[in-house]
């Protein structure tokens, strides 16, 4: 696949594959954990999009500092009037320009190596007619939330997974188009 030119900053000339988006409302106290988990990613082929849903705390100031310091991945910030998490998701989807996207909540973190695993897996299945990928979620101690996937299950819809007895949170990575 030929690289798409998006823009040239001091560190990026190729369009990223993944947008990690984070809706946030008064989360200056939890966003550092999310940011640190993104800094630890071995693969930096992503953009972090923070949609601030009308925060009154120091979220904007904190993100501006990160934008000035961060050199390994792009951080985008959008402020909007408070309307609820669902409206922040809508704004995110209106502004995503990468092939894939995933939501990481403002009080969560991304597991080490997750970006690489997402992109490597996508490279293997991108030409199939998939809407995205489903992964397992874990708590901060690494315990899987709910049930894992049956060994025989290689593809499914999320609805069919739950109808077959699947349980727990799952991490959904969507094809943007």
Feature roles, as predicted:
Residues 113-146:
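Conserved donor NDP-sugar-binding/catalytic core segment of glycosyltransferases
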């Amino acid at each position: 696949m030929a690289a798409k030119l998006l823009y040239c900053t001091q560190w990026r000339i190729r369009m990223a594959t993944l947008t990690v988006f984070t809706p946030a409302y008064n989360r200056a106290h939890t966003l550092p954990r999310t940011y640190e988990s993104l800094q630890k990613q071995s693969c930096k082929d992503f953009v972090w999009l923070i949609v601030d849903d009308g925060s009154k705390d120091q979220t904007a100031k904190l993100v501006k500092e990160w934008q000035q310091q961060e050199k390994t991945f792009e951080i985008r910030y959008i402020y909007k009037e408070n309307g609820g998490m669902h409206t922040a998701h809508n704004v995110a989807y209106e502004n995503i320009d990468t092939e894939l996207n995933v939501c990481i909540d403002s009080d969560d973190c991304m597991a080490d190596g997750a970006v690489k695993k997402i992109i490597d897996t996508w490279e293997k299945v991108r030409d199939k007619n998939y809407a995205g990928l489903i992964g397992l979620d874990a708590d901060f101690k690494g315990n899987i939330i709910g049930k894992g996937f049956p060994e025989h299950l290689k593809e499914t819809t999320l609805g069919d997974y739950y109808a077959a007895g699947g349980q727990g949170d799952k991490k959904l990575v969507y094809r943007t188009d």
